[in-house]
């Protein structure tokens, strides 16, 4: 048995214990698949409350129950702001959920996904179809490489860049650095925009504020928006957009088939509670 699951009173549990002040446990039915990649331990489990779950180094990343919320929010919001996106880059997002949502836009010509760990993509496509959709769209190009190095080699290339990173721990920490956001800016076309997840403003307020501030120092326009993702610690999750030109939702009527995003969500997600308005 791996070090992330344990038997308690005869039941199998996944125990997240990477935080000093908070531990979260999930009772699971079985381990569907797991492997140790060159970068991390990758595991798919079947949990009682949240269904099939992608776990990286013992930390839940997405589930078949609520993964659509995060993936729809990190994808449809920026693609509803840019009026004529043709070329999209996704950095990270190995569960393929963001790419699956982006593929719903027929006007997109290219969806490049740069994921450092091929094992995450392989296991998600095989064992997590509720999130990955077993993606097979020919416009999606999987590039197994370091996203930070990739964008340095591709200047003025993309209309929209989606940074679907894990939490800022280990090799993912660099995806929250100001220098990385500058490289993203340089990789975008003159009217391009980017989005990244900026953590829970409840449990990680400093990171949310720092991310919003760093992007605001580089991009002429930046906005914070929120969604509720039950499996993420703190539940309330934030996303930050940085844009060279476009600021507002341009679609008159949202017509994509989704479970969470609709016309009302496109607008209301930018309405922030008072405690968040203090630093935005």
Residue ranges of model-derived segments:
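N-terminal glycine-rich anion-binding loops that anchor highly charged ligand groups
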Residues: 42-52
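Conserved Class I S-adenosyl-L-methionine
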Residues: 181-182, 207-229, 240
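A general beta-strand register signal
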Residues: 55-56
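SAM/dcSAM-binding transferase cores
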Residues: 2-43, 213, 234-280
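Structural detector of well-ordered beta-strand residues that form the stable sheet scaffold
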Residues: 194-195, 223
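The AdoMet/dcAdoMet-binding core of the Class I SAM-like
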Residues: 2-13, 62-193, 203-212
């Amino acid at each position: 048995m791996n070090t992330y699951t344990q038997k308690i009173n005869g039941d199998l549990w996944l125990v997240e214990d990477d935080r000093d002040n908070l531990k979260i446990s999930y009772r699971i039915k079985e381990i569907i698949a797991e492997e140790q990649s060159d970068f991390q331990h990758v595991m798919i489990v079947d949990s009682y409350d949240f269904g099939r779950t992608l776990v990286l180094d013992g930390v839940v990343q997405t589930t078949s129950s609520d993964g659509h919320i995060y993936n729809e929010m990190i994808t449809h919001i920026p693609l509803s702001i840019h009026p004529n996106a043709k070329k999209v880059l996704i950095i990270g997002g190995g569960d393929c959920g963001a790419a699956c949502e982006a593929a719903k836009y027929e006007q997109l010509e290219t969806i490049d996904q740069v994921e450092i760990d091929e094992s995450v993509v392989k296991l998600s496509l095989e064992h997590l179809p509720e999130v990955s959709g077993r993606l097979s769209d020919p416009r999606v190009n999987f590039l197994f490489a370091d996203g930070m190095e990739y964008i340095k080699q591709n200047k003025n290339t993309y209309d929209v860049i989606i940074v679907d990173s894990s939490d800022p721990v280990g090799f993912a920490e660099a995806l929250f650095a100001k220098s990385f956001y500058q490289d993203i800016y340089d990789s975008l076309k003159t009217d391009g925009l980017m989005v990244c997840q900026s953590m829970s403003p409840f449990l990680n307020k400093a990171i949310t504020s720092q991310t919003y501030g760093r992007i605001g120092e580089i991009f002429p326009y930046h906005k914070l928006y929120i969604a509720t993702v039950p499996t993420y610690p703190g539940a309330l999750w934030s996303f930050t957009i940085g844009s060279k030109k476009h600021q507002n939702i341009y679609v008159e009527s949202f017509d994509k088939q989704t479970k969470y995003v609709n016309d009302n969500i496109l607008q209301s997600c930018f309405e922030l509670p008072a405690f968040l308005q203090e630093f935005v």
